[in-house]
Amino acid sequence: MCVPICSCENSLISNKFIDLQVNGHGGVDLQSANSIEQVQTVARSLAKHNVAAFLPTIITGSLEQMLKQVTLLNSAAKKQSSDEAKILGIHLEGPFISKTKRGVHPEKWIIDANLEIAKQFVSLGNIRLVTIAPETTGANEVIKFLVKNDVIVSIGHTNCSYEQAMVAFDAGAKSVTHLFNAMPKDLDSGIMRAIQESKQVYVQIIIDSIHCTIEQMKFAIENFADRLIVTNDPITAAGLGDGEFPFGEMKLIVKDEIARRQDGTLAGGVATMESSVKILKSIGANDELIKDLTYSRALELLKTTL
């Protein structure tokens, strides 16, 4: 497809963003936050970087801990003020994911898709998006249940085949979590072929020149521009510089704007949506496309407005 090209380096862009994957911000980790005030710190920190709304994201942990964090986030969502980025719902990134593509998710808490556990999460309310690996046992049943209950299913942290991805999309999965990360990167791989063929599926991507190469970002824009969504996948350290920061049960080391576990595994992002916009402009995206990728498209996926 034809991609709009930015004709003016300093042309105006939308100064409001939506982020569908926020693990933490402003020094607070949402995996271990234990007060509404801490969640508010995240929301205020995001707002300072022009994020209008977001999905607080809980990664794989013990069932008890994940349920506790969902309850806390729901309480915080009911007590928001005008200086906070709005909570649009909760993103569960796990625990039904692939152990081989787990990234920094703790392996001991990763489980096959489980309908009864999915029901526990949904019963708490406000679950808007769930990342799942379609190759896990029971995934198809859980996907259908989530879709029936108006939860968006996103394929991610997966090593699935083409056939498994297509079965998931046919069951109602309508998104992909952080393209090129925690999945096979080869364009001829099963999941990549399935994504390219499934025009109804939205594609989320981290734009920070760390999680994806310039070539991968250009490929995504050239092939998925009308269904692409930019996320930052920010962690506790976002915007705070180098250092050690908590992330669930582990510590992450940030050096030169790259967050890694102690064993070197790449973790979430530390960039901002403003920096993502600069990268998008540098590779030729125009203002209209940038607004779509960083704001409008996310609302379209969520079927909501601000």
What name fits each language-model region?
Residues 21, 46, 92, 146, ...:
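Conserved, mostly hydrophobic/aromatic
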Residues 42-43, 67-74, 118, 143, ...:
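Generic structural signal for well-ordered alpha-helices
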Residues 16-18, 154, 230-231:
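Residue-level marker for buried hydrophobic side chains located in beta-strands
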Residues 92, 99-190:
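Divalent metal-binding pocket/active-site signature
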Residues 22-29, 40-69, 85-98, 125-135, ...:
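Divalent metal-dependent hydrolysis catalytic cores, especially in the metallo-beta-lactamase
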Residues 142, 164-289, 302-305:
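Active-site-adjacent C-terminal substructures of enzyme catalytic domains
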